[in-house]
Amino acid sequence: APYLIMQANHSGRYSNPGNKPAPMIAYRHPILEQYRAADDSCIVTDDYLKGLEEKFGEAALLAKEAGFDAIDIKSCHGYLLAELASAYSRPGEYGGCFENRFRLLKNGIRAAKVYEDDSFMVTARVGIYDGYAYPWGFGVSPESGTTPDLTEPTRLVHELHDELGLDMVNLTMGNPYATTHVTRPFDFGKYEPDEHPFVGLSRMIHGIGAVKKAVPEMTVWASAPSYLRAYADLFTAGAVEQGLCDGMLFGRMAFADPDFANEIVKNGRID
């Protein structure tokens, strides 16, 4: 039977209730605000963020009661928890230092893990690099420009395993609303990237691999193989063989060819 995971997310900057933009942001981001307007009134308060922590526990209980096998606390792709990861300039309990920026993620996971047992797991999707230079993105240092610096992402995955008891995470990169080519390398899309898709594939799998090798006890699922289309299965097999990940999550491929996994099992390859 399929292993069903319910994703728990706060849309943050991309909140769209009633099909009307209503951004809720961690801090003002001049680059992202070129794509979607926001102002100081959109910045969420510490009290609001604190109130969200238990919401992830409530979501876990609902997911468990609905028959899901796991809940995934989402901290990637430009949504609220991921934006807090780069809230270096935000004052208060949810910004500035590493501990504050990941307070909501960690406390949300703790609230969800109350309902964990042999039949229900808590996991997370974690963005390890946004694609922007400091101070506008996570996974970089003040000195690294837009080159990934995985010191903090590696620390986070270590702590998710050692402190919170997470056994499994999915790692990913980028913001599909803005740095789409970082999240999912492509050769046909809404803009022309300034790099070959292979560059994005390499950055993704080797970045994830660096974290996996630093935290080998964590089961790590990698992301974004679909650009390779019919060769994505071979890419995945090689990544697992080289110890860069324990498995791969497919997004676009699953939409385009929902039966692709059965094709691999039955025929040995994606058709």
Which sequence ranges carry the predicted segments?
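Flavin-dependent oxidoreductase catalytic cores
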Residues: 1-271
